[in-house]
Each structure stands twice: as structure tokens, then as C-alpha cells.
Amino acid sequence: MEYCEGGDLCSYLERRNNRLLSENMVWRIFIQICMGVYYLHSKNIMHRDLKTLNIFLAKDNEIRIGDMGVAKVLSAKNAFASAKVGTPYYLSPEVCEEKPYNFKSDVWSLGCVLYELCALQHPFKAEN
């Protein structure tokens, strides 16, 4: 695994002490994340735990997606996953309801990451 000197995206945002990222920086980071997820999906790999803790900053703010521990390879025969895995703040409604889910759940998580990049907080907060 490549060493990412910038650490994870969550820590990077925390180190900024609640200072918002510029719009250009948000897009620069987010587009790279989307390209990485697109690549995974093109190989039929669903990450299933996309979050700022699993996105890393390499040299020159280049993005790397890590922690593939719960990733799943989907196929035409098995086009859905059913195990409830991931981090609650980033889970799609299908996963929360323990329904079958597919790549669209990663897209939901991407939306949560984008919200966090823009607002420096999770889109949904609850005690349980």
C-alpha cells in the first residue's frame, strides 16, 4: 500500500480547525474520489465503506481510496449484496433497512462525503 503523507481526509478536515475548504478544493478532491470509485465500479468492485477516514491524501493532494476490507465483487449472477457493513453516517437507506443493495450505495456514500467536505459535518446526526 502506498504511503499517503497527508493522512486521511477526516484528519485533514479536523486539522483545518473548522475553516471551510474553497469551492475549487472541494471539487478537486471530490472529482478524484469519484474517479476512484468509478474505477472500482468498472471492475465490479463495491467499496461498501466510503468515508473520509478511508480516503487518503498523497503528494500534491492527490487522492487515494483505501481500506478495501469490506469491499465486494459483484457479478451478473450476483448483482446485489446483503450484509449490513459500513459506517452508520455514510450508509444508504437500503443498507440501513437490510435490503439488497448495489453500487448505488457507494454513490450515496459519495454524497455524504461531499456534504462533509462542504459543511465540515455529517449530513445526518442521531443518537442511534
Name the predicted role of every residue range.
Residues 10-20:
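AlphaC helix of the protein kinase catalytic domain
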Residues 29-30:
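Activation segment signature within eukaryotic-like protein kinase domains
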Residues 119-122:
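Structural helix C-cap motif within protein kinase domains
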